[in-house]
Amino acid sequence: MGMACGVLAPAGRVVAADAKSLNIVFVNPGKTGEVYWDMVAQTMQAAGRKLDAHVEVLTSERNYRTMQELGFGVVARPDKPDFLILSNEESAAVPILEAAEAAGVKTLLLSNTLIGEDAARLGPPRQTLKTWLGDITTDLQTAGARMANALISAARAEKWQSPDGKIHILGIGGDEITPASIARNAGLQLAVAAAPDVVVDRMLFANWTQSEAEQVTANYLSWAARKEIRPAGIWAGNDPMALGALRAATAAGLMPGRNIQVVGLNWSEDALREIRAGRLLLTDGGHFLLGGWSIILLRDYADGCDFAATSPRVEAKTSAITRDNLAAVGDLIKTRAFDRIDFARFRARAGRCGQYDFSVDALISSLTLPEGTAD
């Protein structure tokens, strides 16, 4: 596994004056207006502006067939891009990777890599598919566990046990097939397996949406009331689902933050607002920055500092935002002023290719002051 926290160059590496301008295409698996994927694309384009790379974004509107058609269209272009960035959402990227291999287009997988039979058949990057350069993902299993442990700690501190002496939690996952979802859900199960006083009453799936999460939460809460179970916490695999859970809990007469806790993931502005209000315990994340980090990997690769010198698989850590550290990154997310990030600072140093520090602390230290702010 590649390093996402190596040695950070004090000033990074600027793009050489004679370096080739890069053309990069990103096939966005999300919907227009879907906060997480919009932010991934925006950080890509902000990094591209700093690193002499033009980033074209094509949006598949959460339809894997559209995603494949867009990918096939890119690799069939007479004027091919230098790099094509894909996400293996719904495990649908393999046909595009294979078409890119045949066309000689270099690819990078972001957020979701190959799993199961695909991984077994194709092996690691650069083996069967020579033009598949690698992947950049986040350690979402640890994120899922951290979210669950925060719920458990809060419930224990408040003594929110049910009459059976157990802490009862609802789990809401996005889906059962996307690698990033599987990892988050596994983190929840790991944390609960280590906590004999905790029970996950239900693991329900809400297709990543607020409306479906609101419905499944309402159903769970009415079931819990009938069974005389005291619900202590709701673990949601992304922020929209956490917001749906908040709405359902409030409608059921509960007071999130006071007699039940909810956690989410995505660092979305709506979630930060709920944290500030004391209704949401935390949002894990920062993984939308994979967009910017992916451009750094490809710029370094193009300039002869191949990240595969460490590993073709780069893994970045996520972090939780709570009321304690909200001020440090809240403004960046609210304004989406990603041009404040000095992406050149994160480039690998010569002789240390593939070693990156993509931590939240490094991010905070790289930020320039907002325009109009005095020194």
Which sequence ranges carry the predicted segments?
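Extracytoplasmic "Venus flytrap"
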Residues: 21-43, 47-48, 56-70, 86-91, ...
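Short beta-strand elements in bilobed, periplasmic/extracellular small-molecule ligand-binding domains
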Residues: 49-61, 171, 193-207, 257
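Short, solvent-exposed amphipathic alpha-helices that sit
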Residues: 35-50, 143-147, 179-198, 216, ...
